[in-house]
Amino acid sequence: MRRRAGGGTPPSGIPLPSALPRPAGSTPPPSGDPSGAVPARLGLLPPPEEPDALEAWYLNRTPFDRGPLAGATWQGEIDRAVLWLDALPYSGRAVELGAGIGFWTVLLASRGDVSAYDAREDRLTRARQRLLAHGLKAHLHPRKLLEGPEGEPAGLVLLPFLLSQLAAEPRAQQVEVAHSWLAKGGRLALIDLAPPNLDPSTLEQATSEMLGGRFTEIVSEPLGRHLILISALAK
């Protein structure tokens, strides 16, 4: 499993169900770390912080994974995630928490009103440039993602590559915050990294544990080697 330069921690995927053992050979969290996450597949590093590196991560232009096959499957799964998000039904405005460089913001803006939030202004600057290049508009806000909602309740809240990078406590807080943004019956959409060797039959249990009791009609789908798509409606 590849690690960040300088001895950083390995990437994390969506947590496995609490009742299941970790896959053989996976890296356990450090002592006292309640993250409940496991390393992501094929050595994919988590989303980088810097805008240029994040662009490369999405486009797979640098060796974030092991070899050309992994790169090809990554891009194919990203393309499928785009089609999935574009087809998700919702009404009202969309909110994106962790918008980054605006990769998904452009798609949401093409469908209607969207407010996109990220903790870093430099990433939102890149998102603004991407929107302008497509002739689209969105409300971009530099803001901590755990802050409470503003404006009218949303019909869709998107969390792209966010929950898998959080330890258990902030992950639960982020799910609670995402729920607070939504109107009753509003849709939560997650696009995130998969853990290695995840049995699809356990994915529903893992997702239900992660989302708690705030959502219904939970649908989760592993795309293959890298990604998981999750949709749920707010109670």
Where are each of the predicted segments found?
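Class I SAM-dependent methyltransferase core
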Residues: 96
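Class I (Rossmann-like) S-adenosyl-L-methionine-dependent methyltransferase catalytic domain
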Residues: 2-92, 100-134, 142-149, 168-169, ...
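A short glycine-rich, Lys/Arg-flanked "PGG" loop and its adjoining helix->strand segment in the class I
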Residues: 172-184
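Conserved H-loop
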Residues: 137
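A conserved beta-strand element that flanks and buttresses the S-adenosyl-L-methionine
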Residues: 158
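Short catalytic micro-motifs in class I SAM-dependent methyltransferases
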Residues: 161-162
